[in-house]
Each structure stands twice: as C-alpha cells, then as structure tokens.
Amino acid sequence: MTFRQATKEDLPSIIEMIANDTLGHLRERFEDPLPKEYYNAFESIDGDRNQELMVIENSEGEVVASFQLSFLQYLTYVGGIRCLVENVHVREDQTGKGIGKQMFQWIIERAKEKGVHLVQLTSNKLRPNAIRFYEGIGFKATHEGFKLHL
C-alpha cells in the first residue's frame, strides 16, 4: 500500500468512491466530466496547509481508498492541535482487506508527527459497520454531534 497526497487526476476515483457510499449516492454527482465544483474544492483543500487529502494505492497503482485530514489549532488543551478525519472511503471491492486499519495506523502516526493531541471523527448513524470499525480500533463515542444543513 502506498499513501500519498491526492492529485487532481485522482478526483474521479475519489468521487466515485464517495458516490458509491451509503449516503453518497444521494448527494454526489459522479459524472463524466466531473462537475467543476469538485475541482474548485480540490484547489481550496490543496492550497490550505492545514488540510491533507490523501489516497491509498494498491500494488497495481489503483486508488483503493481516500481520506481527508484537517489540522485544527485550538485554545483548549493549552493551545493544542486536533486532527479531524473526514471523507474516509475504501473502494467497495476492497473492504475487509485490512485497508482501514492500515489507514488509521498511518493517520495516527501522521497526527503524532504534527504534534496533535486528539484525533476525532464523526460517522453517520446510518453507517453501523463504520461505527463498529471505529470503536474496534479504539475510538470512543464521547460527545453528541449536531449539524445544521444550510
């Protein structure tokens, strides 16, 4: 497995994984060509030093997973840094092969390199398998999350 920063050329593979997700098929637009909004978002993420959009390639060079890390400076924890993990996706035909565990081992090491004191994520309640996975690798459901769609 190779972990690397995503490039613009990876966007079709990333968006396809997101669109094939339980909820993604309801809100994403995986089309050829991709809507320009995805490329605009990529440019914004890529230009922000506190964001890392990553992909994982298999030995054949195929993108089999992706995730995004946001490093957030806080005043709490004596000015600590949190790592927010978002958009975790493993290609459907690659689930159950240990990619998720390798991904989170890599994420935790990267967070330590950046001086992070806390790694956090959210998972939709409609994804019970993902929730079990996160609990199985040590994450704890410690807070109630709230969202307001605009």
Task: Kindly give the residue locations of the regions a language model identified.
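Conserved GNAT-fold acetyl-CoA-binding loop/helix
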Residues: 22-41
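A short beta-loop-alpha structural element at the N-terminal edge
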Residues: 2-16
